[in-house]
Amino acid sequence: MRHFHSRSAASSMTALVLVLGLGLATSARGQTASGDGVTIITGDATRAAFAKGTPLIETAAYKVHASRREGPGTAEVHARDIDIFYVLEGSATLVTGGRPVDAKTTAPDEVRAPSIEGGTSRAVAKGDVVIIHNGVPHWFKEVRGSFLYYTVKVPTAASATAGGSRIDRP
């Protein structure tokens, strides 16, 4: 298995640490707030979210989803959001780059398509962190078994799209 990230992974991982470590200071189901800017999403709430594949928290500054797939997904392109995935369970084939086939705009700055033509296929599995910058088409083409992963969405300026690189695990 390989671990992939972009050239600006340090800033994206910093965003992930800030989002998860400095507190999720908004109101959502299964959270407790201590009044000091720290929010805890309980284990029960997290497990329930993963059972259905639903968001844990969504704010204007970031979103954290408990993502679940049992089969292939839809190709996506986000004009503004960086996606950071952390795979908890399962494995999948992730296609990035290329051209979305029969793409449709589904929301402002969001495009969906049934597939991607000409992209790069990569195997991802438990423990992998994947950072996909805004503007990069991506698609979970094949999913083996239950595929559970955290998704952290960090909005950024559309001009912040960066190239990617690969880091192999030791």
Language model features: what each stretch is:
Residues 79-100, 106-115:
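Short, conserved beta-strand element in jelly-roll/cupin
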Residues 1-9:
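N-terminal secretory signal peptides that target proteins for export/translocation
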Residues 123-143:
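Conserved metal-binding segment of the jelly-roll/cupin
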Residues 76, 83-86, 121-122, 130:
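His/acidic/aromatic-lined binding-pocket segments of jelly-roll/cupin-type domains
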Residues 11-25:
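Bacterial N-terminal signal peptides
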Residues 22-80, 162-170:
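A short, N-terminal "cap"/entry segment at the start of jelly-roll beta-barrel domains
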Residues 145-163:
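A short hydrophobic beta-strand segment most commonly corresponding to one strand
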